[in-house]
């Protein structure tokens, strides 16, 4: 469960950073 959650977070964070900072 934790590895999957960590993988999901790792894939989601860059997307949020990209959207928020507008730096892709």
From Swiss-Prot:
Gene Ontology annotations for the cellular component aspect, listed alphabetically: extracellular region
Domain of life: Eukaryota
Pfam family, one: Antimicrobial_1
Compartment(s): Secreted
Tissue: Expressed by the skin glands.
Disulfide topology: 18-24
GO BP term, example: defense response to bacterium
Keywords assigned: Amphibian defense peptide, Antibiotic, Antimicrobial, Disulfide bond, Secreted
Primary location class: secreted
Role, per record: Antibacterial activity against Gram-positive bacterium S.aureus and Gram-negative bacterium E.coli.
Similarity comment text for this entry: Belongs to the frog skin active peptide (FSAP) family. Brevinin subfamily.
Protein name: Brevinin-1Lb
Upper classification of the organism: Eukaryota, Metazoa, Chordata, Craniata, Vertebrata
């Amino acid at each position: 469960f934790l590895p999957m959650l960590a993988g999901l977070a790792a894939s989601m964070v860059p997307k949020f950073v990209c959207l928020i900072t507008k730096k892709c």
